[in-house]
A protein has these predicted regions:
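Oxyanion-hole/transition-state-stabilizing segment in secreted/luminal serine hydrolases
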Residues: 1-35, 40, 51, 55-61
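A short helix->loop->beta-strand "cap" motif at the edges of active sites that frequently abuts
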Residues: 45-49
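Catalytic His-Asp segment of secreted/periplasmic serine-dependent ester chemistry enzymes
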Residues: 57-148
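Hydrophobic alpha-helical packing residues
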Residues: 34-37, 41, 76-77, 125
């Protein structure tokens, strides 16, 4: 119970977990563990929105056979979303090139993202996350934050 320490000031929480389990556990087992974490967040931070991210693809291309299990897992993670407090987003496609390949600049080891991958991830996630944060300060034309 003390594993997840949250307070009521959290507006949103992003979960990206499960890739390290993909080799040893079934999609159902991994999704079940993530569902337990989502429930813990709901109990400890009842006002927080939870954005569950799809597990990123592995290998040199999005349609690489290694990703079959990841696609199955992501389908189960999508089912966790209720559209009220729990949301799902798959940013994996944003990491791929138009032909479906994943460049070494984005994922040098076919698993971990590098700076170009982080930038794509951020851009893909930004609109959804902004929609979950109704109380965030607005930008002014000078680029400074307007407190309200």
């Amino acid at each position: 119970d003390d594993i997840l320490q949250l307070d009521n000031t959290i507006q949103a929480l992003v979960l990206l977990i499960g890739t390290n389990n993909a080799g040893a556990f079934t999609s159902e087992e991994i999704a079940g563990g993530i569902q337990k974490l989502v429930k813990m967040v709901e109990e400890k931070a009842p006002e927080a929105k939870v954005l569950v991210l799809g597990v990123f693809p592995r290998g040199p291309a999005i349609n690489d056979p290694k990703n079959t299990r990841i696609h199955a897992l992501n389908a189960k993670l999508k089912d966790l979303a209720d559209g009220k407090r729990v949301f799902y987003l798959d940013v994996g496609p944003s990491l791929a090139e138009p032909d479906g390949s994943i460049s070494r600049e984005v994922m040098p080891d076919n698993l971990h993202v590098a700076l170009p991958g982080f930038l794509r991830w951020m851009e893909a996630m930004k609109p959804t996350l902004e929609g979950l944060l109704p109380n965030r300060p607005q930008e002014t034309t000078a680029g400074q934050q307007d407190p309200g």
